[in-house]
């Protein structure tokens, strides 16, 4: 009896086992679509970035002009640039939803998968940061200066490290050139780590909304979830191209339409919106080293979540009403921190940012304690 070629060919068999014939829980919700959407975003960013790199010039005298040239003279260059710039924003929207789903449904039970995912998160933030420097506008230059200068807070090696990153004594041509190289390299590293992420996920099997063992109730990924993913892609493209075609500069800082000038400081230096929550936490600490530690800890604390798995009976917040309230409060805190990051450094925004920073980190302390309390209650 003949078997389908996808089950007999060595390469197709491996791909089929990872996608087409993958046994999946039968009760996935819409929140499980964001993983495939992230893969789609990564492909969009790599392809659009590849074509943009063919026309971009990584030199301080030409970078800003080359970006203007792409928008004005290159066939559909304006579309490529809009897709790439807004694609980054949509990438982070999907990423935050994906992480939020993992926290709500306790996907950190799969420790290797979760930790690789957090590494991908760090690498994605690094990719976005070095990419933001490339247009060489005012916010690009001053954002690079401020953020890279934070490394000088590291004891003993800080100053040397900053000069090593800059390639000199200030943000200049050497900095721009190496940032362009990093921005080209990192997405392929993210793609490789995504394969590792999927490898670990397929070793353990996926979580599900109830957090229960679903070995007795699995269905093949294709057609059931492939069609669901395609439906998600269609909705994504609909919203994405509304932004790309009608509001191409909606997520862009107006300061970045001014060429970089080391002699003129912008009124309010801020990163892109997807870094603002971490930037607000950084600003809330009056000490420079403390601010840098808090900035890194705001994301690195995700590594600590798998350490709490021994404290709970169930593997989903569906069974923990108090923790559901706490989780959605945490989401509100995240959004408020993003808003605070846009505000000038003055009262009452400084004080509000400090309160929100304390509440942000308090979630990671209170959540396991309330989980344990609820388990003991019933």
Swiss-Prot record:
Entry's Gene Ontology BP terms: mitochondrial electron transport, ubiquinol to cytochrome c
GO cellular component: mitochondrial inner membrane; respiratory chain complex III
Subcellular location: Mitochondrion inner membrane
Subcellular location, principal: mitochondrion
Entry note: cofactor: Binds 2 heme b groups non-covalently.
Cofactor(s) required for function per UniProt: heme b
Annotated positions binding heme b b562: 84, 183
UniProt-listed Gene3D superfamilies: Cytochrome Bc1 Complex, Chain C
CDD domains per UniProt: cytochrome_b_C, Cytochrome_b_N
Annotated membrane topology: Multi-pass membrane protein
Homology family: Belongs to the cytochrome b family.
Protein name: Cytochrome b
